[in-house]
């Protein structure tokens, strides 16, 4: 299967394309990312649930750690009360294993690990682990023997699937780098005051090549000269160019935004719409709630089969294929309940589940079908791997940058023309909105620039960065503009009037 990696250093995100279709989005630089290492401070302890909240020094949420994740801190294995392990204001070295959701903070562990392309260093473990994705028994025996020889005495090693067939010198070189990283973390922890961030994997190029590059990668496109140098460095360091197929690396230099050129913005836009049309004519609705996600499948106008039974089966199989794709592109995790079109035949139900299992097997997040309930609902779970697309856009103003630099993102133009015409743009109506926008979008200097805003579900979205040559810009929705002179968002009527006379001084005051 052909594989193309598109990296946008400007937007700090990347996309993995299979046969021209976007399968996965990769984003870096979140407030809390998996594998970030903090020197935290114990804030609260709840002995009833054997858990504690750790102050990480920023944002609104504290991290959550359970007693089962405090292994290195236990002086004795049989300790079963967290109050015997942690005390208030105690310093603790922790790592994020689950990113925060809209209402919960990040999940933490004291079992620190450092990941490379081929191996994972486990400083607080002495075990040797081989990835389950390595099926060759001879290769597993070889890697285990190699680990016994090279493993540090007080640390453990885990071999990733990419370690198959790799020369020992390359693995030794990576082990050396990981040990140096761990030494750096330890020294930083000793010399720092908690709470503080000690280690963060912010390099989008490194993250993509380490976690997603494989022998099927044929093309890599990147939009930055500096990023291109980093890309060549990591490919050379990890000896990715020694594989049977050497990928073609291209620097993207067209005027069109790279996210538009490869359809990434369009894919994100479509993934924000609850309704998804099926190829055969049916459709489905995807609604994500706090507890679970609901998917409802409908046949719509599809009626190209000889019988109603065949129509239902084809529609359900088409929906199963699309659901497997939508779970990946939207990064929907947790409990998922699917209401397929009712089928009376158990043979058809079995055929649908077999087809659905086959489609889900291509997903790295390992979705598992739990059961087909008596009501005909398919229940499955999907392992959490970072934030969902909806969470990225809803929870963090930095992720409004998802849509920056794109002046033709079609989904952000879905407005109700009738309501727009009826909207009254006066000083009293706009005052609260303007204050909110200024507070949300211009609290950080890197966002203080002329910008477009769009209203989606009562949420303002930044559409694009505009050239610094323009002093103001009318928006399509609210008729608001950003004034460089006053560093505020103002109603267009007030600002345009100020070009001829100072009629907006009363409003600014």
Curated annotation (Swiss-Prot):
Signal peptide residues on this chain, from the entry's feature table: none
CC terms in the record's Gene Ontology section: chloroplast stroma
Top EC category: hydrolase
Cross-referenced CDD domains: S1_RNase_E (cd04453)
GO molecular function: endonuclease activity; metal ion binding; RNA binding; RNA nuclease activity
SMART domains the UniProt entry points to: S1 (SM00316)
Keyword vocabulary terms for this entry: Chloroplast, Endonuclease, Hydrolase, Magnesium, Metal-binding, mRNA processing, Nuclease, Plastid, RNA-binding
Family matches, as PANTHER family: RIBONUCLEASE, RIBONUCLEASE G
Similarity remark: Belongs to the RNase E/G family.
Name under which the protein is recorded: Ribonuclease E/G-like protein
Lineage: Eukaryota, Rhodophyta, Bangiophyceae, Bangiales, Bangiaceae
């Amino acid at each position: 299967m052909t594989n193309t990696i598109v990296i946008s250093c400007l937007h700090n995100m990347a996309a993995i394309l299979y046969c021209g279709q976007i399968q996965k989005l990769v984003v870096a630089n979140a407030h809390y990312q998996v594998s970030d290492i903090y020197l935290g401070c114990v804030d609260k302890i709840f002995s009833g649930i054997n858990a504690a909240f750790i102050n990480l020094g920023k944002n609104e949420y504290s991290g959550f750690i359970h007693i089962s994740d405090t292994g290195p801190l236990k002086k004795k294995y049989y300790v079963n009360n967290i109050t015997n392990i942690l005390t208030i204001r105690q310093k603790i070295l922790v790592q994020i294993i689950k990113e925060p959701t809209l209402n919960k903070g990040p999940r933490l562990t004291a079992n620190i690990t450092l990941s490379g392309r081929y191996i994972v260093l486990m400083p607080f473990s002495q075990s040797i682990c081989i990835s389950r994705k390595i099926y060759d028994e001879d290769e597993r025996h070889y890697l285990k023997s190699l680990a016994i020889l090279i493993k540090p005495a007080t640390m453990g090693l885990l071999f990733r699937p990419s370690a198959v067939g790799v020369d020992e010198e390359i693995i030794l070189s990576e082990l050396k780098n990981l040990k140096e990283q761990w030494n750096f973390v330890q020294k930083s922890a000793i010399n720092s005051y908690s709470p503080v961030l000690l280690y963060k994997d912010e390099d989008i190029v490194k993250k993509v090549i380490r976690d997603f590059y494989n022998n099927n990668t044929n093309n890599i496109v990147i939009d930055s000269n500096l990023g291109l140098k980093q890309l060549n460095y990591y490919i050379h360091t990890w000896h990715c160019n020694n594989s049977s197929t050497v990928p073609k690396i291209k620097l993207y230099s067209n005027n069109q935004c790279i996210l538009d050129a490869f359809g990434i913005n369009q894919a994100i836009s479509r993934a924000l719409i609850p309704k998804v049309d099926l190829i055969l004519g049916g459709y489905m609705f995807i609604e994500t709630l706090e507890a679970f996600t609901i998917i409802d499948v409908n046949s719509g106008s599809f009626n190209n089969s000889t019988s109603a039974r065949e129509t239902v089966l084809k529609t359900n199989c088409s929906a199963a294929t699309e659901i497997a794709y939508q779970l990946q592109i939207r990064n929907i995790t947790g409990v998922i309940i699917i209401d397929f079109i009712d089928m009376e035949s158990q043979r058809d139900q079995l055929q649908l589940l077999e087809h659905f299992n086959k489609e889900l097997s291509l997903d790295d997040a390992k979705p598992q079908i739990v059961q087909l309930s008596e009501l005909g609902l398919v229940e499955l779970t999907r392992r959490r791997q970072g934030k969902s697309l909806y969470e990225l856009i809803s929870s963090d103003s930095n992720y409004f940058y998802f849509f920056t630099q794109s002046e033709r993102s079609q989904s952000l133009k879905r407005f109700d023309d009738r309501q727009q015409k009826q909207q009254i743009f006066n000083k009293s109506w706009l005052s609260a909105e303007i204050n909110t926008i200024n507070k949300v979008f211009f609290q950080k200097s890197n966002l203080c620039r002329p910008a477009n805003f769009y209203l989606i579900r009562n949420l303002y979205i930044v559409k694009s960065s505009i050239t610094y040559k323009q002093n103001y810009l009318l928006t399509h929705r609210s008729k608001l503009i950003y004034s460089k002179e006053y560093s505020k968002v103002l109603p267009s009527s007030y600002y345009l009037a100020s070009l001829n006379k100072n009629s907006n001084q009363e409003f600014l005051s």
